[in-house]
């Protein structure tokens, strides 16, 4: 049986996180399954560059997307219907992580290092981490990955090798999570891309209060299968 959310944690209270840089809460520790799950249950996530110590964050405000509020433009709706994409779930988790971590034009390095891939691979094996994948003609062309606890989904990263391929994955995820009774998708930090799809910032205090409810709802362990 899953242990209930409590105030006991490896981490200091999120209210003590720095204002500048926004949300930096702690440095150090490890990427064990126990510590990662504890972090997520308290609204904390790891984010650090290679060769840096592990850094743990809880920014204020927090970017969230209620699944029922996913925004689908007319052009994206057309892509969902007619682009010839195939959706798969939890079939290529490590491949999705590696694609998300691949160097991108205009970006220096990547925070999705080999230790991160190994750590989240263990979460996947334990049924907590998930990949939502967009395929075309047997090729992985986009997708995202994240962590689910109770009825809370924490989005981590997404990638596209074709236009809108990651958006298609996010829309399908949001629609399925709504059917399953998930309350929020955590988007961590504000970006124009996520805002265009309905995500919005909320105060950290509101986020952690809602989080405390959602992580204690019945857990759906992976691998997942979406409704057709």
Curated annotation (Swiss-Prot):
Gene Ontology CC terms: cytoplasm
Broadest EC class assigned to this enzyme: transferase
UniProt main location, coarse: cytoplasm
Single GO term (MF): leucyl-tRNA--protein transferase activity
One protein family per Pfam: Leu_Phe_trans
Cross-referenced InterPro entries: Acyl_CoA_acyltransferase, Leu/Phe-tRNA_Trfase, Leu/Phe-tRNA_Trfase_C, Leu/Phe-tRNA_Trfase_N
Subcellular location per the Swiss-Prot or TrEMBL entry: Cytoplasm
The enzyme's E.C. designation: 2.3.2.6
Origin: domain of life: Bacteria
Signal peptide boundaries: none
Record's catalysed reaction(s): N-terminal L-lysyl-[protein] + L-leucyl-tRNA(Leu) = N-terminal L-leucyl-L-lysyl-[protein] + tRNA(Leu) + H(+); N-terminal L-arginyl-[protein] + L-leucyl-tRNA(Leu) = N-terminal L-leucyl-L-arginyl-[protein] + tRNA(Leu) + H(+); L-phenylalanyl-tRNA(Phe) + an N-terminal L-alpha-aminoacyl-[protein] = an N-terminal L-phenylalanyl-L-alpha-aminoacyl-[protein] + tRNA(Phe)
SUPFAM superfamilies: Acyl-CoA N-acyltransferases (Nat) (SSF55729)
Record keyword Aminoacyl-tRNA synthetase present: no
BP term (GO), one: protein catabolic process
Keywords for the protein's UniProt record, in alphabetical order: Acyltransferase, Cytoplasm, Transferase
Gene3D superfamilies: Leucyl/phenylalanyl-tRNA-protein transferase, C-terminal domain, Leucyl/phenylalanyl-tRNA-protein transferase, N-terminal domain
PANTHER family assigned: LEUCYL/PHENYLALANYL-TRNA--PROTEIN TRANSFERASE, LEUCYL_PHENYLALANYL-TRNA--PROTEIN TRANSFERASE
Function description: Functions in the N-end rule pathway of protein degradation where it conjugates Leu, Phe and, less efficiently, Met from aminoacyl-tRNAs to the N-termini of proteins containing an N-terminal arginine or lysine.
Protein name, as recorded: Leucyl/phenylalanyl-tRNA--protein transferase
Species of origin: Thiobacillus denitrificans (strain ATCC 25259 / T1)
Organism lineage: Bacteria, Pseudomonadati, Pseudomonadota, Betaproteobacteria, Nitrosomonadales
Gene that this sequence comes from: aat
